[in-house]
Structure formats: structure tokens, C-alpha cells
From Swiss-Prot:
Highest taxon listed in the record's lineage: Bacteria
Protein name, UniProt field: 33 kDa chaperonin
Keyword list, A-Z: Chaperone, Cytoplasm, Disulfide bond, Redox-active center, Zinc
Chain segments annotated as transmembrane: none
HAMAP family the record matches: HslO
Amino acid sequence: MKDHLVRVATQDGTLRATAAVTTELVDAICRRQGTDPTASVALGRLVTGTALMGSLLKGDQRLALMIEGNGPVKKLHAETDALGQVRGSVKEPISGIAPTETGFDVPAAIGRAGFLHVVKDLGLKEPYRGMVQLYSSEVAEDLAYYLTSSEQVPSTVALGVYLEKDGRISAAGGLLVQALPEGEEALIALLEERLVALPPITTLLRDGKGPRQIIEELFAGIPLGRNEETPLVFRCTCSRSQVLGMLKTLGEEELKDMAAKDEQTSVVCEFCKERYSFSSDEIKALIA
């Protein structure tokens, strides 16, 4: 099943929801980052949550989510655009947190204390920036807490990453359900009951159900209006010219020191791990 998301809204405007399968996306990002199993689950959850929240973007808008905690992975970062092009990174890919009999201790990897940062480029003069303390460090609950408390949209988020015994990611996906203003309380209550009874996302995906089937099961008997599908892919926006521009922002003295070493300067993209190398002459050309 190719990675994609399905976004729907009820005809009466009471609810909207997005379901996604992100298995290939999460696997591609975690392989590039070299994550251990627990870090893979933590990063995979944030990548999936970013894709879900990105379904609300339009045009050239972009979204970035960052989790900074006092755990061994230190920082998780994921970005997306309205086209479903996603990338992600982790500061320390080896969490050292072994899987337990019941699963993965993601809060131990992230840390119990920390913050969720949200940055939205909506095409305005300045990006929108939001921040909340981590609610549980499970990622899904942290995103739901942010959406409900900061954006004032009651939200439920479910995220899952399933690893085989050999560490291979065999299923990843998520679900975002939001209640809109002046929604019908009875309908919201019905959805809440169904969400409680819904099996884990990875169980549904491993049973062969895709985002559309998950949505149809959740909203059975409820008239739907808008219904959109978007492919999800890993894509990094870095480039050689972009890195040169970043180097140019360094101070003149620092650039002179780099150029004087008469050896190549290398910069590695934190997301895709592409290495960009520049000669001392190229560094000298950056000095005004």
C-alpha cells in the first residue's frame, strides 16, 4: 500500500478527519537517520503526526513540528508542505532505550520534561509560532493537547509505528479527528465512542485496511462532504545553493578561518544526510 492520506469532513460541518498510512515514509526517514528501534518509533510518530496536521495546509504553506525533551534523543524535528512532501530528523538517533514486553518506552526516549514547538509558514510576513509543554511525551497526546489548548480545536490523535523483531518498520500510520465549532453534540459523542473502540492504527494497517477503510469504518452511517486524497513522500528541500547561502550568514572572521585551512569545508544536511563540500576558493568568494 503506497503512503497517502485521506481527508474528510461531515456534510453538516461538525467534524473533520484525516487518516494516513506512512510506512514507507517513516522507514525512509529512519534509515537515513540511523535510528535504533525506540528512536524509530518516536520519530515515526512525529513524522506521521506532521503529515496529518499538514493535511490542513494550502498552496505554498509549510508546517514544522519540533519536540525537545530531556531524554536521550534530545530533539525530534519533522516538516511538511501542502503537497504531502515530508522530511524528518532526530538529534541523537541512538536512544539506548530497549523495547519492553509491552512495546516501546517513547516517553523515556523523549524525556518527561520538554516542549512541543509548532511553526507554520502561512505566507504572511512572519511565521506563526506556537509552543506547549509536553503532555505525556507519547507524541499523539502531545499533538492533541496542542491542537485543543493552543488552536482551540478539540482533537483526537492516534499514531502508530510497528517494528518487526529485526527492526524493520512494517506498518506506520495515524488518525486525526477534530470537532468544529457549533458541532452537533450527539454526533461528537458517537465518534468518541467509536474512537475508544477502534483498534490500534497499526493493527488496522496490518489487517490490510487503508486510510479510506479506516475513515469509512469510523464514520459509518454519517454523511460525508469533502473527501480528498493526497500521496505522501519523503522529500528534502536542501540544495548546494541553499547551503552556500547558509554559510554566507556566518561572520567574516569565521569564513576567513575556514578559507585559510586550504581544505574542503563539508556540511551534512540534518534531514537527508546529503554531504555538500566546498573548496577554500568557494569559501573565499562568500567573503564580502
